[in-house]
């Protein structure tokens, strides 16, 4: 039962992360899980999923929106990651 709950939480967090929610929002959900090895694993997985930015090649304008949201700069897709314009 505990594995099923952990898997359900994990899939829910991955879904939320891939829907445009930022990592900090999903990590707040991870904080609700009791402090143990499972929590550490979920935090690491959410961090890795958030870094890959799957929406980059799939959605036109994703990187521009992402960079405007976090740095107020224009952005472009570079592989599976967004690159924000330098000053």
Curated annotation (Swiss-Prot):
It is found in: Secreted. Disulfide bonds join 56-77, 63-82, 67-84. The keyword RNA-binding does not apply. GO terms for molecular function: potassium channel regulator activity; toxin activity. Residues 1-19 form the signal peptide. It comes from the Eukaryota. One of its GO terms (biological process) is defense response to bacterium. Keywords: Antibiotic, Antimicrobial, Disulfide bond, Ion channel impairing toxin, Neurotoxin, Potassium channel impairing toxin, Secreted, Signal, Toxin. GO terms for cellular component: extracellular region. Residues 53-87 form the BetaSPN-type CS-alpha/beta domain. Expressed by the venom gland. Belongs to the long chain scorpion toxin family. Class 1 subfamily. The primary structure of this cryptide Pep-3 is identical to that of cryptide Pep-3 from other Tityus species (AC P0DRE8, AC P69940, AC P0C2F3). This is Scorpine-like peptide Tco 41.46-2. It comes from Tityus costatus (Brazilian scorpion).
């Amino acid at each position: 039962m505990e594995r099923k709950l952990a898997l359900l939480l994990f899939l829910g967090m991955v879904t939320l992360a891939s829907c445009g929610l930022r990592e900090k929002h999903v990590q707040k959900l991870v904080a609700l899980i009791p402090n143990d090895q499972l929590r550490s694993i979920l935090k690491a997985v959410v961090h890795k999923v958030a870094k890959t930015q799957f929406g980059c090649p799939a959605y036109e304008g994703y990187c521009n929106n992402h960079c405007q949201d976090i740095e107020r700069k224009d952005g472009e897709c570079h592989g599976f990651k967004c690159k924000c314009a330098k000053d």
